[in-house]
Amino acid sequence: MKANSTKLSQLMKSVEIPFIKTEVPEIKVGDTIQLGLMVKEGSKTREQLCEGVVLARRRKKSLNTSLTLRCSFQGIGVERVFFLNSPRITFVKVIRRAKIRRAKLYYLRDLLGKAGRLKQIFN
């Protein structure tokens, strides 16, 4: 039974490899990133920029790698989940890195203004 599951996982990895993006920079929780997203409106497509703090990251090295990004849109906090290997994502750029001690930053949801700032790492 175990041999069949390993064969299946190897088969899944071989199918996923061509679809995994290689030009994505290393993104950690707490980073402030800028993300380009292709949005289709009617018959036209345009690129929408989204900038925010990464609250969570899931499945680091697979095709299903996703991250939760918290953006501020017109003074309201908006959280969106993005799949990094999606063809709709055109680019990802790390703007700022922060010193954090948590794996998930969900506590930032409750903080407002200066209380929600993270300590920046200067490298």
Curated annotation (Swiss-Prot):
Gene Ontology molecular-function annotations: structural constituent of ribosome
Database matches in Gene3D superfamilies: 2.30.30.790
GO biological process: translation
Keywords: Chloroplast, Plastid, Ribonucleoprotein, Ribosomal protein
Signal keyword on record: no
Protein's cellular compartments: Plastid, Chloroplast
Family annotation (Pfam families): Ribosomal_L19
Record-linked PROSITE patterns: RIBOSOMAL_L19
Cellular component, GO annotation: chloroplast; mitochondrial large ribosomal subunit
NCBIfam families per record: rplS_bact (TIGR01024)
Family, per entry: Belongs to the bacterial ribosomal protein bL19 family.
Protein name (record): Large ribosomal subunit protein bL19c
Species of provenance: Pyropia yezoensis
Lineage: Eukaryota, Rhodophyta, Bangiophyceae, Bangiales, Bangiaceae
Gene field: rpl19
